[in-house]
Regions:
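Active-site groove signature of glycoside hydrolases
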Residues: 135-150
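Alpha-helical transmembrane segments in eukaryotic/viral proteins
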Residues: 2-36, 40
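Conserved, mostly hydrophobic/aromatic
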Residues: 89, 100, 141, 195, ...
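Long, acidic (Asp/Glu-rich), low-complexity accessory segments flanking structured domains
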Residues: 27-94, 105-133, 137-138, 201-205, ...
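Active-site-proximal loop/turn and secondary-structure-junction residues that shape catalytic pockets
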Residues: 103, 145-147, 201
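Short, aromatic/basic amphipathic alpha-helical patches
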Residues: 153-163, 206-214, 283, 323-330
Length: 348
């Protein structure tokens, strides 16, 4: 055999081995990623679970399932954090939504990093339909980031004013927005959405655009607290990029401490991991995290900070993940006494 022929054969063997190894790794990663998916079917209880909560319960005391980067179901794998539409997530019991609008070709679309996805308007239509059909429920809409320029904020505001007129919680009192949010009971908010806006480009300044609009409330930045914010949600990329166990052991206590040192209000406990290289994608990392996160959530009633647990935000939310979070309301004491037994059976 000639040297050229021998080299060609070796090269083919090397290529085959590389392809084989890549296939093995890809298959293993795909297997891990499937663990992220919640395939449990929703039921009527999940659609109206807030009907079991006492009217006089403060909104800040209810344990609420939420979704991270809620409108990403149609995005490519690197940006996709949900496999269900917001309409489907609402049916599964989620009541907090992280919606990030960007102006693209004159239309508002959802973005996650550099990737864009579905139109915002149909999402708002679904929210209106859900609130109208389910007057016992309350939604928390967190428009925490905007892309493009201030036009994206203006168009989002106009869209909400048009579509959700009469369905948004409004501060018509003499209270500051922060004190107003802290005072809200479920009776005050049933059948409505409470809407929070973040800043346009940076997390360091107050969101001045909400001034004079009594149904827009300010939320904090990822790493700081904007003065007067009614929603606190903390994020440190260096922590969220850790392994699942390190994240739960180190990040959650830090975020709880940050909330305790804040002015208060609604508290979003971020339960998702971040892809450290932005290539593998959220689905794989949620697959490595789901079992640990589920176990951690089950342990929350035994934590000394359980009283502060409010909104728990996850990737790839579905009926099973939401039901587990909703069930914590029994331990929180937020369920009406005459509905407690039925609630417990629905969560079992």
């Amino acid at each position: 055999m000639s040297k050229i022929g021998r080299k060609s054969k070796i090269a083919l063997i090397v290529v085959f081995c590389i392809v084989f190894c890549v296939g093995i790794v890809a298959g293993a990663m795909a297997g891990v990623a499937t663990k992220a998916i919640d395939n449990q079917k929703p039921d009527e209880f999940l659609r109206s679970w807030m009907s079991y909560v006492s009217d006089d319960t403060l909104l800040t005391d209810i344990v609420i399932p939420g979704s991270h980067d809620s409108g990403t179901t149609k995005m490519m794998w690197a940006a996709k954090t949900q496999d269900k539409s917001i309409k489907e997530q609402m049916a599964c019991g989620a009541r907090y939504f992280d919606i990030r609008p960007q102006l693209k070709d004159g239309k508002l679309v959802v973005f996650h990093g550099p990737i864009t996805g579905e139109d915002v308007e149909p999402i708002i239509d679904d929210i209106k339909q859900f609130l109208t059909a389910n007057p016992s429920e309350t939604l928390i809409l967190d428009f925490q980031h905007f892309m493009s320029d201030e036009t994206a904020i203006e168009k989002t505001y106009a869209l909400l004013s048009d579509k959700l007129d009469g369905l948004m919680v409004a501060n018509k009192t003499e209270l500051s927005d922060l004190d107003f949010v802290k005072s809200l009971t479920l009776a005050d908010t049933r059948g409505k959405a409470i809407v929070f806006f973040g800043n346009v480009f940076k997390n360091t300044t107050n969101c001045d655009y909400i001034n004079g609009k009594n149904y827009l409330f300010q939320r904090n930045g990822d790493s700081d607290t904007r003065q007067g914010s009614g929603l606190q949600s903390f994020y440190d990329g260096s922590l969220n990029r850790k392994s699942s166990k390190k994240y739960l052991a180190n990040a959650i206590p830090k975020y709880v401490d940050a909330f305790e040192n804040s002015e208060g209000g609604l508290f979003v406990m971020q339960m998702q991991l971040t892809d450290p290289i932005a290539i593998i994608g959220p689905k794989f990392y949620e697959g490595t995290h789901d079992e640990n996160a589920t176990r951690f959530i089950s342990s929350l009633p035994g934590k000394d900070y359980f009283g502060r647990v409010n909104i728990i935000m996850r990737d790839f939310v579905g009926a099973e993940k939401c039901r587990q979070i909703i069930a914590l309301n029994k331990d929180k004491g937020t369920i009406a006494n005459d509905k407690l037994s039925e609630f417990a059976s629905k969560c079992a």
